[in-house]
C-alpha cells in the first residue's frame, strides 16, 4: 500500500491536531478554511511549511497516565523546562512501543541541549548541585552531596541515569529509623516534583503547546510556592490564548490519556 497523506492549505501555526485512540482530528483555526477533519489510517499530514509523520507520535495514545507523568518528570528534569508537545509525544510513543525509562533518559542525556545545561560534566559535585536545583528546587544538603558524588565518581551510577535515580529516590519508601526532618524534606521534594509534573502535563498534553521559550518561562515562574503554581498555570493559559488563534502556533493535543491536572 502507498503512504496515505492528508494535505492542508495553510501553515502548521494555524492548526490544532488532536490524537485520541486511533483517530486524528485536524482543525483549521483560520475560520474554517479547511474545516475539521477526523482521520484514520493516515500516515502523514502535509502543510505548506512542513510534513508531520504521525507514525512518530501515534502510539502515545497507548501510554498509561502514570507512565506519561513519569516521562514528563524526566523531561522537565533533563531539559529544565516544560516539555514541548511534539517531543513529549515522540518519546511517549517510543515508550508505548517498548523503549524503557533508562533507554529514554540515556537518549535524552545525549542531546546537546541537555548536556550544556548541566555545565561541566567532569565536575561531578557540580552536577549534583545543579541537579538538586533543577529537579528539587533547592540546594543539595551535605548528606545528599556525600551520597551521590561518590556513586558518580565510582561509576556505580551512570551520569546519564543520575536524574532518573534522583527522582526515584524521592519516591522511594522512607526507612523507619529516619528523622522527622528527613521525612519532612522528602515530602517537600515529592510535592515540588508533583507540582512541576502538573505544569508540564498542562502545558504539553492538555494545551498541546511546543514553544520552547514559553516552556522555559513556565518553569521559571514556579518556585515551589502555591502562589507561584497558580502564576505558572495562569501563564500557560495566557500563552495558550495567543497560540490558539488563527495565526498562533501549532497545537498537538493528546486526548484521553491524562486528566487535566487543574480541572475543578
Where are the model-predicted features located?
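Acidic, glycine-rich low-complexity repeat segments characteristic
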Residues: 1-64, 128-130, 135
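Substrate/cofactor-recognition hotspot
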Residues: 43-264
Amino acid at each position: 500500500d502507498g503512504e496515505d497523506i492528508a494535505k492542508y492549505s495553510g501553515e502548521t501555526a494555524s492548526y490544532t491536531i488532536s490524537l485520541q485512540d486511533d483517530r486524528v482530528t485536524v482543525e483549521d483555526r483560520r475560520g474554517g478554511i479547511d474545516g475539521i477533519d477526523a482521520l484514520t489510517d493516515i500516515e502523514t499530514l502535509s502543510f505548506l511549511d512542513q510534513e508531520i509523520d504521525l507514525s512518530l507520535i501515534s502510539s502515545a495514545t497507548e501510554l498509561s497516565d502514570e507512565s506519561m507523568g513519569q516521562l514528563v518528570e524526566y523531561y522537565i528534569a533533563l531539559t529544565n523546562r516544560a516539555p514541548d508537545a511534539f517531543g513529549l509525544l515522540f518519546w511517549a510513543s517510543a515508550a508505548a512501543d517498548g523503549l524503557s525509562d533508562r533507554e529514554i533518559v540515556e537518549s535524552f542525556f545525549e542531546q546537546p541541549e541537555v548536556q550544556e545545561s548541566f555545565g561541566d560534566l567532569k565536575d561531578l559535585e557540580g552536577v549534583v548541585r545543579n541537579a538538586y536545583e533543577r529537579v528539587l528546587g533547592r540546594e543539595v544538603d551535605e548528606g545528599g552531596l556525600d551520597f551521590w558524588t561518590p556513586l558518580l565518581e565510582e561509576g556505580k551510577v551512570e551520569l546519564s541515569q543520575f536524574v532518573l535515580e534522583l527522582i526515584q529516590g524521592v519516591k522511594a519508601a522512607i526507612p523507619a529509623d529516619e528523622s522527622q526532618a528527613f521525612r519532612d524534606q522528602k515530602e517537600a521534594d515529592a510535592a515540588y516534583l508533583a507540582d512541576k509534573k502538573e505544569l508540564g502535563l498542562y502545558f504539553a498534553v492538555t494545551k498541546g503547546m511546543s514553544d520552547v521559550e514559553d516552556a522555559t518561562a513556565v518553569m521559571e515562574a514556579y518556585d515551589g510556592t502555591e502562589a507561584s503554581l497558580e502564576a505558572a498555570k495562569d501563564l500557560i493559559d495566557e500563552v495558550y490564548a495567543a497560540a490558539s488563534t488563527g495565526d498562533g502556533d501549532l497545537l498537538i493535543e493528546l486526548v484521553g490519556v491524562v486528566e487535566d491536572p487543574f480541572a475543578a
